[in-house]
Structure formats: structure tokens, C-alpha cells
Regions:
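C-terminal lid/capping helical subdomain adjacent to the catalytic/cofactor pocket in oxidative enzymes
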Residues: 114-120, 124-185
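Active-site substrate-recognition segment that forms the wall
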Residues: 1-24, 28-116
């Protein structure tokens, strides 16, 4: 990464389980409004029904840089805390990957100071599917010279994570452990 940006984003693992297709009555009982839901924890969990009737349950940010050996074993207890009635339901798919997280959890959109013709958009903090479309539009408009929205986002300050490359991830893991403990209380 460019040195100007490198310390502003940390990688974190995020994981998702997909159940077998659920019966219609069960789906209606679990999510009667068929809406996407997330909790209010710092490292949030989220869930929704897929178009074919599966429950998709995701979250469990992992800041260690290592993926769990078994995503299902890692995520299933979280799913069952929210939906105990799904005990015994088959998990047919599981996947995960790295996301980029910024300290303030806001997308980082701007241009490099040293190379003002180089634009960047990063650190969607798990909201990339939604925010990348907006960021791409803002960057495209800025390239065309219409930069009002781009300029607004590029003025948002983004701190560099403390600790330098060697301590950045361990310090974040400690900080997130603190927030996790608060979430549990």
C-alpha cells in the first residue's frame, strides 16, 4: 500500500453461514418482515433471508489475521444464540474473507497528496457491497471535475492506527476484546 494509506486500514476476517432452505412458516417466524438485521455490537453480527429461503448469518470479525479452521464451528454458537430453534438445521454453505476496517468505520475516499491524480476508496468496514457503488460514483464525478460530493468525503479525517506495522494488529485485537467485553455486559 501507499505509505499515506497503509496505516489507516486494518484487515479483519468476516464469516457467513447459510442454512438449508427453511420452511415458509419457519422463515416467517424467524424474520416476519423479511428484513436484513444487525445487532448494535461494535463487532456486529447480521442476518437475513436469501431469495431461495435460507438464513444467511454473518459477522464474528476476527482481527488476528488468521481464519478459523472451521467457519461453521466458529459461527454456529452465535447463530444459535439468536435463533435457538435452528438447532439441528443443516448448514449447507460457509465462507469468509478479509474486509478492510478504518478506525472511525467510515469509508475512506480521497486522492493522494503526492499524486493528486491518483484517487482511492477503501476501508468500507464490512459495508462494501453498499458503499462501493457510492464511492465509485463520487470518484467518477471527481475525475469529470464535479467534485462536490467527493470533496465532502475527502475532508473526513481518518486517523492512522497506533503501533506501527508490528503492533497495529495486536493493539487492535486488544481494543476489540475490550469492546467485546462491553458488548457482553
Amino acid at each position: 500500500l501507499n505509505p499515506e494509506l497503509g496505516g489507516k486500514v486494518l484487515p479483519a476476517g468476516s464469516y457467513i453461514l447459510a442454512t438449508q432452505v427453511l420452511e415458509k412458516r419457519l422463515r416467517q417466524r424467524l424474520l416476519p418482515q423479511n428484513m436484513a438485521v444487525c445487532d448494535q455490537n461494535v463487532a456486529l453480527d447480521y442476518y437475513r433471508l436469501s431469495a431461495d429461503g435460507r438464513l444467511l448469518f454473518g459477522g464474528a470479525c476476527n482481527y488476528s489475521g488468521r481464519d478459523p479452521r472451521d467457519i461453521k464451528a466458529f459461527m454456529l454458537p452465535k447463530l444459535l444464540r439468536v435463533f435457538p430453534e435452528l438447532a439441528g438445521t443443516a448448514i449447507e454453505f460457509q465462507w469468509g474473507g478479509m474486509i478492510g476496517i478504518g478506525a472511525n468505520r467510515l469509508p475512506q475516499i480521497g486522492r493522494l497528496k503526492e499524486y493528486p491524480n491518483v484517487f482511492y476508496a477503501q476501508a468500507y468496514s464490512g459495508h462494501g457491497l453498499n458503499a462501493t457503488h457510492m464511492a465509485a460514483k463520487l470518484v467518477a464525478e471527481a475525475i469529470r471535475g464535479e467534485s462536490r460530493g467527493f470533496d465532502l468525503f475527502s475532508r473526513v479525517p481518518h486517523m492512522t492506527f497506533p503501533g506501527g506495522p508490528a503492533l497495529r494488529s495486536p493493539l487492535l485485537a486488544l481494543g476489540m476484546l475490550w469492546h467485546r467485553m462491553k458488548d457482553l455486559l
